[in-house]
Structure formats: C-alpha cells, structure tokens
Amino acid sequence: MPTHEHTQWRTLALMETRLALDAETKPQLKTGTLVIARGENTYVGRSDYGIEYEGAQVRSILACFSGTRTCSEIAHELACDLDNVTSLVAELDALHFLDTQKSAIVLSDRYRAPGADPISDSGLCDDNLDATFQQIKSRIRPELSLTTWGPEVRDGGVSLMSARQDQPVLIYGNSRIAILLYGILLSSGLSQTTLISDEPSRLIGDIDLCGGFLRLSDIGSSQNERITNIRPELSLFPLNCAGSKNPREIAISVGPPTPELLQMWMSECIPHLFIEDPECASITIGPLVIPGTTPCWRCTALTQDDEHIAWTEVQWQRRIAPRHETPVSVAHHVAGLAALELLHFIDTGNSDLLGSTFRINYLSAIDAKYRTFLHHPACGCRW
C-alpha cells in the first residue's frame, strides 16, 4: 500500500483506469522507471516524482512487470491475490509508469517471412531472417524511450513511431540547419521527409561541413544528388516507394519563404513551421501555423510592425542582404529544437510553437525569449 495520501484527482483517475484493465492485461514498466528497495518498502518512479509502497510482496510483483505475463499469470505464479496485482497495475498506470497495451510497427511494403513473430519485445513485427528488422530494433529503442512518455501512451510509444512512417514533411532551404534537420527527421522515423532546395544545381561546399552527415569527399558534388543517395542510410525505416498514405503534408521553411509558398500553404491548409535566417547573434524559430486555427506568419509580422517603427524596413533589408550561415553549434541546437517540436506536433497534435516564437541568443542560448502571438485584426487568415 502507498504511504502517502491519495488526492481526489488520483482516486478518480484510478477508478477510470481499473475499468479499462482486466486480468489479461500484460503490464510493463515504462523505460527509465526505477524500482528501488528501501528496507521493507519499495520506491517506484524517477528522480522528480514517484510512489513508495510498504511490504516486500510489492517488489516481487513489480519484478514480473515485463510485458510478457498477464496479471492472472503473475498472481498465480506468486500465489497472491489477483486484486492486489490489478490494483497495483491500475495505480501505476494512472501515474503513467506502466505500458498496458501491445502494438506492432508494421514496415510499409515489406515482405514478412512465414511464421514470423507478430510482435517482438521492441514492438516490431519481428523477423529474425531480415537484417533490416534487426537494425531497426536497435535504432528504434532510443526513440521509444521518448514516445512512451507521451500523454495517454500505453503501448510503449510503438503506435506513434509506426505512424511517423507515413507523415510527409517538406523542408524548404539549403542551409546548415535545413540539411541537419533533414537528417534528424529521417533518423527519427519520418521516412517521407524531402529537402527542397531553392538552388537545384547547388554544389556542396566547404561551408556545408558542420559535423553532420556530409563529408569532405562530398565537396563539389551535387547537393540534390548527395541528399537523395544518403536518404536510405539516414532513414530509420525503409523508404516507402509507394508514397505516403497520409495526405496532410507539413512544411518547414528554413529562411524566408516565397509569397507563392505562403499562399499555397494557407489556401491548402498545410501546417507550416518557420525558421528564420540568423540575425546578428540570434535566430528565431516559429511560429508553427495551422491555417485557419492559429495565428499565421502575417499575424506575427503585423503585430511586430505595430510595436516597432522601422520593423518593416528592417525586414526588407534582411531579405535582400547576403545570407550568413549559422555557427556549427547553433545549427545543431536549432535543428534539434525544431525537430523535437515538430515530432511532438506530429505525435500529439500540439506544440509550444503553435502561434508562438522562440528567439535564441547565441551568447545566452539557455535564456531564450519565448513569445505568444494572437490573431491580428488586420490579417485575413480567419476571415
């Protein structure tokens, strides 16, 4: 039994959870959840929150939470009351420390050998004879350690990872950030990611080498050809030659987009994320726009134009001025943050960048400025 007092919201959550669980549930502790013996008591949780139980039997029950045995099997094996097992499962599930469902990642357009195990411990449709499956099992584990902690996720994050395969993402740009972001998204499971350069004939140069996947031997090669050739190596999942099953694209503009692109994204209701060109020793990520729902890029522009006398003139000068590359450390930082927010949006439908911007100062990257915008009355994005 827990040693701390139950709050009302936990009691209600526990009652709802028990209704969804039964004796055939196969509980598994989420990745990173700690079970620590404290004398006769047992602590379950992590460094920032957890719960402590009295009695040695709880520890024996927890040791069986591996996802391979049902609650009834655990109770029979330990010769304990089934209600004790299901009550423990319900409470830990309400605290989001357990996975209680099984899902499988089915790779798009892949042959499966007869008799292959439908679900492995990693959540993959397993095939011991397929080297691709074995490689993916190793690469997917770190990704699942993130997705399993998402809200209402009870299958280890497997279904979220599986859905990423069919989500098309278009990255517009050819800067360090754009190229790094392309590699990160492919390696994170977004196999339908495409990098679209505004210079189709651009060659890889010295400045493109920034600790990413481009090498010294790539200098002088066509950027488009190299990006296309490296794609199968970067992608977590095999590429689906049949194309995406998800019709809703997501666009990312690294640098200023053309008016034609902006109009297309808004008119076709394509969610889009902005990553501005660097300005002096700072750079802005956002907003992430859902057309017709959240404030658009023009809303943010009109708001800032109201606040700063020369804002419009400054923006025009920035568009015609020579572009400058970001420092290597900043490029990796920005690409990583943008990728995390985009993945969170794809997985959950939510993001801190919806209608908001994140301005990073190179000299104090931790002390970034987060700002939320409202729909501007002079903008017609909601008319």
Label each region the model flagged.
Residues 2-383:
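Adenine nucleotide-associated cytosolic modules
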